[in-house]
Amino acid sequence: MNILVVKTPEELAEAGYKLIKEVVKSKENPTLGMATGSSPLGIYAEMRKNKLDTSHATTVNLDEYVNLPHEDKNSYHYFMQEQLFDHLPFKQTYVPNGMASDLEEECKRYEGILVANPVDLQILGIGENGHIGFNEPGTPFNSPTNIVELTESTRQANLRFFENEEDVPTHAITMGIGSIMKAKQILLVAMGSKKAEAIKELLQGEYSEACPATVLQRHPNVTVIADPEALSLCSEAIADEHRQVFTISDLLSDSRVGETAN
């Protein structure tokens, strides 16, 4: 697992963008797994600013709220249109349909899309409790795309995007952990002390469904981009090894900088 330590959101955005650009430019028909929320915003801004040619790329999104119309400003359909799809051309884009009349069938349909479009690079954030996508603690590591009931902590974390607490959706469709693990490469981004406990579990915690992110310990190609605050609860050995700023060029040149032993 490669750890890239950055000092600012701008450095995180630039590093994440360069990793995405490398995948997009090196693949004939790349598939990008897209995340939403605040974590990837800077990366998407870099993609827009640099007018990255994504005309040959397909995107698949991690998740979507249930019963939130696509035109609602808090839906992930709307988010992706605002952040990327209205600005850059893509070969094809896919977001789960949380308005589907048969949600179980929608999960099967979306899992089929993932099988037909193997993900080259999956972008992830990480929840304070270690969730990835909307896969909460206790989710089986082999889970496919599924419907989840959002925990109170996740709903509270997302409350800032809504006017009232009752407006925050209670359910979502999410790629399962098993689906996420099929990606050829994973980029996880985290900033701030609120993510410190989750990052500690990811890097040195027990491999356990109690912390969904620990599944990444078994993935062969993961890059974590984090700031010192997000790494602040890691052991001294981890801190000594990673508390310096490496460049994304090191990662792109197959350097073993910041590689953790699992």
Swiss-Prot record:
Origin superkingdom: Bacteria
Pfam families per record: Glucosamine_iso
EC main group: hydrolase
Reaction it catalyzes: alpha-D-glucosamine 6-phosphate + H2O = beta-D-fructose 6-phosphate + NH4(+)
Claim: Hydrolase is one of the keywords in the record: yes
Biological role: Catalyzes the reversible isomerization-deamination of glucosamine 6-phosphate (GlcN6P) to form fructose 6-phosphate (Fru6P) and ammonium ion.
PANTHER family registered for this protein in UniProt: GLUCOSAMINE-6-PHOSPHATE ISOMERASE
Name of the protein in question: Glucosamine-6-phosphate deaminase
Organism: Bacillus mycoides (strain KBAB4)
Lineage, opening ranks: Bacteria, Bacillati, Bacillota, Bacilli, Bacillales
